[in-house]
Each structure stands twice: as C-alpha cells, then as structure tokens.
A protein has these predicted regions:
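Catalytic-core region of right-hand nucleic acid polymerases
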Residues: 19-153, 204, 238, 242-289
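Residue-level marker for buried hydrophobic side chains located in beta-strands
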Residues: 68-70, 105, 180-181, 338-342
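Active-site palm subdomain of RNA-directed nucleic acid polymerases
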Residues: 149-202, 214
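A short catalytic or substrate-binding loop motif that flags glycine-/basic-rich loops and adjacent residues
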Residues: 47-53, 62-64, 119-120, 308, ...
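C-terminal reverse transcriptase regions that engage the nucleic-acid substrate
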Residues: 219-331
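Non-catalytic, polymerase-adjacent accessory regions of viral genome-replication enzymes
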Residues: 1-20
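RNase H-like nuclease fold core
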Residues: 329-362
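Short, conserved secondary-structure transition motifs
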Residues: 102, 111-114, 187-188, 214-236
Length: 362
C-alpha cells in the first residue's frame, strides 16, 4: 500500500530544523539483517540525509504471548513538523451501541505500519545506521511518526468501506455499521450482512496486498474490541480483563508522576462509560488533574514531576480504581452481571467525552 494518494497533502514536508542531527542509537547487525529481509529497511543512496530516526524495541503482551515490536522514532521531525495529526478516535461510549446488533466481525492488520510503503522521495527523511556503520533508510511507514496513526486510519477506513472516506459505490451498505480504530475494524449488524461485508473487506485488503491478522472474529456474539468485552447475546458490555489489570498495575495516585496521573485519569474516564459511572461525583479529582496538565505545556513542570494531588482528589481517584477492581471481580464470580450501554439521552457518554477533551486541552 502506498501512502501518497490516501492523504490529501504531502505526508512528509521538509524539516525546518536545518541540518539533520544523527542519533547515537544504531540497529544491531542481526536485527538489521531481519529488517532487510522483511523489506522494512534498505541501503541509503548517496543523497543528502533529510532526517534521522531513533530505532528501539518494546515488548508487547499479545494473546499468543510476548512479542517484540520494532519502532522508528523520528524525534526531530516530530518536533519540527508543523502538521498536527487529525483523526476521529472518539470516546469509547461511541463504540458501545453496536452491542445491540445480532453479531459482529472484528479484523485487524498484521504489522500494520510496516505494510505501508514509503514513497522513495520521502525515505531520506528516515535514516539511521547499523552497528557496522552502514547507512540505511526506511522503506516502510515509520511507527513513531506523529502523523502515522492518521495515515493508517485513512487507509484502514478505505479498505473497510467507511462512507466518509470512499465513494458510495465502494462504501459499506447501510445495514452494517463500520467502526475503525487505526488498524482495527469492527463490522456490526445481522450475522448474514456482517459475514457478507467481511468477505468484501477481505477482498479489498487482498487487492491492496494488505495482510489481515490470523486471530479474527467472524460473525461473533462474544468478543473483545478496544479493551471492552461485548456480549451481543445479552446486549451488554463489560471491561476486559486486560484493561482492569492495566489499571491495577498503575502506581498509587499519592506517589504518581504527572504522566502517570494523566494515564490513570484517561483510563478512569474510559471505564466510567462502561460502568455507567456518574462523573459528576468525581469532579474534584478530574478538575485537579486538568489543572496540572497546562503546566507541562507552559514548561513549569516536567512529565516526570510529582503530581502532588490533594488528598481529597487522591481519595476519589483511588475510590474509582477500587470500583473498577471490585466490579470486575464480582462479574467473574457472577457471569450474569453485565452493564448495558447507556442510551443517547443519558449523561454518562456525554460527560465522559466532554471531560476527556478538557483533560487533553493544554
């Protein structure tokens, strides 16, 4: 898949920082061999280097076990590029109503970022060296560039047939609902309509030489999507075990940094939509978090600075964490207990999305 043509502007404008600065991190020789073999990097031609990447790896927990993900971070370009990514990732409450449908199919792209080819004229912006000194450049879409999620969201939406992205002749029928989250697709509706459009999406992906992950749900009534467990049989939703474990693993709010506090607050708002929690009861905690975020933008504090939340705010936050833990434990012992998605007229989804946008405002 090519980046150009999917985004209506040059995706990688020239850097404004002047002379590019080479990073100190290099790709291990063994890793470089594998990346070359996979077609992710190639030897750089004798043209001027426009930008450098910082290569590193992280370990992710997947259903099949631990997986190492290689990331190319163009730090200077992310800082100097004036373009700000814009893609419609909405509050989780927007993705709950499809549980009322009969069934759904869930698909995702395998190694999605590396499936997108970089145009040759942009590859000089993403270079680094191997341990032996060889100069190489990316040939595939870099995971770490700030516009990458938007580009992939557009490509995935086109393959899924989202009506706001493709021509009506190639759009999904009105009988199914399509939800796209970067490289994840959910098709909801009647089981026959869902499986029919799923087959078309697979043909679309094959036509663009895009590889779909092996672990996909086809016409399912029970599945996990965006850290939420969907039960179409009982028309109910609940927090996934992985999400709850991530909340339990977060440090205590009375000793957290500002960055940890922000992550915890965003997950609280996420869970509130699933549990139908009244966020008005936690206004003091949310307001305390919101007041600390502009200080990062203004350079007053660092993300690693202590959050120093007031004791009352800490108590509210830890109380919500306890609610998440207790609710999940009770659900595991009593499977019949479920949360129904809030109706459009109720306060939970509206407050959740509103406060989430205020949290991110700096």
């Amino acid at each position: 898949m090519q980046v150009c043509g999917h985004v209506g502007r040059p995706p990688f404008p020239p850097s404004s920082s002047g002379k590019a600065r080479e990073g100190s991190r290099r790709i291990p020789t063994a890793d470089a061999h594998l990346l070359r073999k996979a077609g992710i990097i190639g030897d750089a031609p004798s043209t001027i280097t426009g930008g450098w990447i910082i290569p590193f790896s992280v370990v992710e927990e997947k259903t099949a076990g631990l997986r190492r993900r290689w990331i190319a971070w163009p730090r200077d370009k992310n800082r100097d590029d004036p373009y700000e990514a814009n893609f419609p990732l909405l509050h989780i409450s927007h993705y709950l109503p499809p549980v009322m449908a009969e069934a759904a199919s869930c698909l995702d792209f395998k190694a999605s970022f590396f499936q997108v080819s970089l145009p040759r004229e942009t590859r000089h912006l993403f270079r680094c060296r191997v341990e032996d000194g060889t100069l190489v450049e990316l040939t595939r879409h870099p995971m770490g560039y700030k516009a990458s999620p938007e580009i992939l969201q557009i490509i995935t939406s086109a393959i899924a047939g989202v009506t706001t992205v493709v021509h009506r002749l190639w759009a999904a029928p009105s009988l199914v609902r399509i939800d796209v989250w970067i490289d994840n697709i959910r098709i909801a509706g009647s089981k026959s309509d869902v499986t029919l459009w799923e087959a078309q999406v697979l043909r679309n992906a094959d036509g663009r030489h895009a590889t779909i992950g092996e672990e996909r749900e086809s016409g399912a009534t029970h599945y996990t999507f965006l850290w939420v467990q969907f039960d179409h049989t009982h028309r109910a939703v609940s927090l996934s075990e992985k999400f709850v474990l991530s909340v339990c693993a977060m440090p205590a709010l009375n000793s957290s940094t500002i960055a940890e506090m922000e992550v915890m607050a965003s997950r609280f708002l996420y869970a509130a939509a699933i549990l139908c929690t009244r966020l008005c009861d936690y206004h003091f905690f949310i307001n305390a978090v919101r007041r600390r975020l502009p200080a990062i933008h203004q350079g007053i504090v660092l993300e690693t600075s202590p959050a120093n939340l007031p004791p009352a705010a800490v108590g509210l936050g830890e109380g919500l964490r306890h609610t998440i833990e207790v609710t999940t434990v009770s659900e595991s012992s009593s499977p019949q207990k479920r949360h129904w998605p809030p109706h459009h007229g109720r306060i939970a989804p509206w407050l959740g999305s509103r406060f989430y946008s205020r949290l991110r405002r700096r």
